[in-house]
Amino acid sequence: MEEALIKRIMPNSLEAEQSVVGSMIMSKDAIVTASEMLLKEDFYHQQYGVKFETMVELYTEGHPVDLDTLQNRLKEKDVPQEIKSLDFVRTLVTSVPTSANIKYYANIVKENAIKRKLIHVTEEIENECYAGKESLESVLDKSEHDVFELLS
């Protein structure tokens, strides 16, 4: 049987990522909640990871987090112009009806990040199996370790 090459998109939710960042602009509590649940790397779309990281930095440094402080800090960073755009940041705030659902949005982002990591782990396992350089026991031990590491 011939293997078909299928272009697959890694698990992600643009809407959840937008909602996390929009909620963080609206509420300090949302910043705390999101920063306890997520890392910059959990965001599939770079622009939201950058905004997430920037708001956490501002909050940690004791600065207010609002449209102006976020845009000013983004201007200091070497990021693409569209990420620095005030219109882009404003759109995030208007697209989120309430920050009360931050845990729900953050959980979606986290679950998709774990799924992407699991895909990478299984690709490594597959490559080790095809290479045939390691014993089955060694491959199984490493596989078990790598999968359980995703849970921590």
Predicted regions and their residues:
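Noncatalytic partner-interaction/assembly domains of nucleic-acid and motor enzyme complexes
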Residues: 1-112
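Interdomain "pre-motor" coupling segment immediately N-terminal to P-loop NTPase/helicase cores
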Residues: 91-152
